[in-house]
Structure formats: structure tokens, C-alpha cells
Amino acid sequence: MDLDDKDRTIITMYADDPDISQERIAQAIKLSQPSVAARVSRLRKAGALEKSVGISPLKMGLYLAKVDLASNEPDAILHMFRSCPYFANGFSVSGRHNLCLFFFSESVATLESIVNGHIRSNPSVKEVDFNIVITTERDFVVPARLRSERVEEPPCGMKGDCRRCPSFLEKKCMGCPATGQYQGSFYQP
């Protein structure tokens, strides 16, 4: 997609203030509001202007984990976490590690339990690097689903009952909010 200076200004103004009015943008780039609306529509259809609503884990006092790993089944790993309430996002990447995953929780021990119980224990995983994010330069927004329908089976596909897991019993893991087997406070009503 070719962007002109007005398109770049529109994108920048939305990046600086997602709630900015099209009227203000129109004044800044010297176009009518309907012309701005048409440009915004075109930019959105092309994927040049996206909106993401969610939570900022670090601002909320939650822990954010970055997990780099090497797996010979990266798509299966991504699929396993797709509906996990703790999963922020995942990326297929080049280099020694072929996946970069982000998770958030109110507990570092829960993040460690996810990594140890679902990633390190996975036979397709060859190497894992687990880190806690301390700060971000830009706001890191996660489109979190804090209210989801209860499910019988954990979204990660884990077999068994969280309540019987040693990490859960020792309060090292908060459990799975999706199944109701959860002992934390963040997802509680």
C-alpha cells in the first residue's frame, strides 16, 4: 500500500491519541472530516490502521513473561496456548529460538508453572529461555478476555485436574481461570 504524507499524519495522530476525533485530524491536515473518514476507512481495510483494546499488564501490577524457545513443532505450541487466559501473544521468529511467547499473571510462580509444566516438559521443545519483563518503552497492551465461558477441558489441552497438580496444591500456580480451577484474584468476579 502506498501511503502519502496525509496518511502518515493520520496514522501518527491515532498512534499518539487513539481517541482523537476525525474533526481534529481534518483541521491538522487541512481536509474535510468526510475526506478524513474515507482515508481512515481505506487505511483500516488495508491493515495500515488497527485498533487494539485490552489491558496493560505492567501498569496493572501484573508480571509479564517473555519466553523464547526452540521447538520442532512451533505451530502446535502456538495452538496449545491460543485460548489460554494467561497467553498474551506468540511470534514465530528466525534465529536460534523459533518462537517468542508472552504470558501475564499476578504471580511469577504461575508463569514458571506454565513454562515448566507445558513448555519445558513438551518433547518437541529443545531449549527454553524464560525472562520477566521489567519495563517497556511503549505501552504493551494485551487484548485479554477477563470474562470467558467456563470450559470442561483446559484450553491448553492439559489432561487432568489442576486441583491435583502439586504446583496448584502448593499455591505455586493459580490454576486455570477458563475451567474455574483458579485460586488467584485477578480473574475472580
What are these regions (language model features)?
Residues 1-189:
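A compositional/biophysical signature of low hydrophobicity enriched in polar/charged and small residues
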